[in-house]
Swiss-Prot record:
Classification via HAMAP family: Exosome_Rrp42
Subcellular location: Cytoplasm
Source superkingdom: Archaea
Protein name, as recorded: Exosome complex component Rrp42
The protein's assembly and partners: Component of the archaeal exosome complex. Forms a hexameric ring-like arrangement composed of 3 Rrp41-Rrp42 heterodimers. The hexameric ring associates with a trimer of Rrp4 and/or Csl4 subunits.
GO terms, biological process: rRNA catabolic process
InterPro entries registered for this protein in UniProt: ExoRNase_PH_dom1 (IPR001247), ExoRNase_PH_dom2 (IPR015847), ExoRNase_PH_dom2_sf (IPR036345), Exosome_comp_Rrp42_subfam (IPR050590), PNPase/RNase_PH_dom_sf (IPR027408), Ribosomal_Su5_D2-typ_SF (IPR020568), Rrp42_archaea (IPR020869)
Sorted UniProt keywords: Cytoplasm, Exosome
Gene of this entry: rrp42
Assigned protein family: Belongs to the RNase PH family. Rrp42 subfamily.
Protein function: Non-catalytic component of the exosome, which is a complex involved in RNA degradation. Contributes to the structuring of the Rrp41 active site.
GO cellular component, one term: cytoplasmic exosome (RNase complex)
Length: 272
């Protein structure tokens, strides 16, 4: 057994011993979220942006709005695309190069939560049906990784979208020209999907796992819900299995925590 495996085994035993007492390595209860900080409009040249600090995990999300062609099967809807960069300085496990499986999963979970909830009214992003629409780029940069990147990134994405403003455009049907005005309007955001992640460690379910807990967890489920209690995304990863009663408990916990997080997002957006 390598030194790293020995350390992981020791950490797992320590975490499991604490969990038997209803405690966690950082002093939280099983249902406690870490401290959450949100700041918006932190990138001057972006249409929208947000910085999120969840415990010691930090992410920066930027929104860029451009123009382009719609998807062929969705000619009357704008486009959303999500990218994630795992900055090597954020964690020793991150390496430079093309996106790895973690970055791809992270981007998909964030994208799906926003897209399936209908958070952005894509119909309102159409300039010329079938030809020209707004393209919204969501770029997530992980600055410091101490666990639960899924929630931090999803929270940052919706906060950045809610802060975003895009230049108004006028389309001249006769000339076919598009004029970009100096006036700005908010991105049409009508829902607030919030992801909440619950990890399973030794039969215990705990919300918002930190990095130590993620390294020894048996499984993980991320549930994204909107303010109406509708589920827009569920992502199970890292192996393991969840019983039906565990999934139902996770949904209830996700709804409760999402409501609390939503208030903090609204507070951050309203403070600007």
């Amino acid at each position: 057994m390598s030194e790293m495996e020995v350390m992981a085994s020791i950490m797992r035993d320590h975490i499991l011993a604490l969990l038997k007492e209803g405690k966690r390595v950082d002093g939280r209860s099983l249902e406690d979220y870490r401290d959450l900080e949100i700041k918006i409009n932190v990138i001057e040249k972006a249409e929208g942006s947000a910085w999120v600090k969840l415990g010691n995990t930090q992410v920066l999300v930027g929104i860029k709005v451009d123009m382009g062609e719609p998807f062929p099967d969705l000619p009357e809807k704008g486009v959303i695309t999500t990218n994630v960069e795992l900055v090597p300085l954020a964690s020793p496990s991150f390496e430079p190069g093309p996106p790895d499986e973690r970055a791809i999963e992270l981007a998909r979970v964030v994208d799906r939560g926003i897209r399936e909830s209908g958070a952005v009214e894509l119909e309102k992003l159409v300039i010329v049906p079938g030809k020209l629409v707004r393209v919204v780029f969501i770029d997530v940069h992980v600055l410091d990784h101490d666990g639960n990147l899924l929630d931090a990134s999803g929270i940052g994405a919706i906060a950045a979208l809610m802060s975003a403003k895009m230049p108004k455009v006028v389309y001249d049907e006769e000339s076919g020209e598009v004029q970009i005005l100096d006036e700005y309007e908010p991105l049409p955001v009508s829902k607030m999907p919030i992801p909440v992640t619950i990890a399973k460690v030794g039969g215990n379910l705990l919300v918002d796992p930190n990095l130590d807990e993620e390294l020894v967890m048996d499984g993980r489920i991320t549930i994204t819900t909107d303010e109406n209690g509708m589920i827009s995304s569920v992502q199970k990863s890292e192996g393991g299995s969840f019983k039906l009663e565990e999934v139902m408990y996770a949904i209830d916990l996700a709804l409760t925590k999402a409501a609390e997080i939503r208030e903090k997002v609204l507070e951050a957006v309203g403070a600007e």
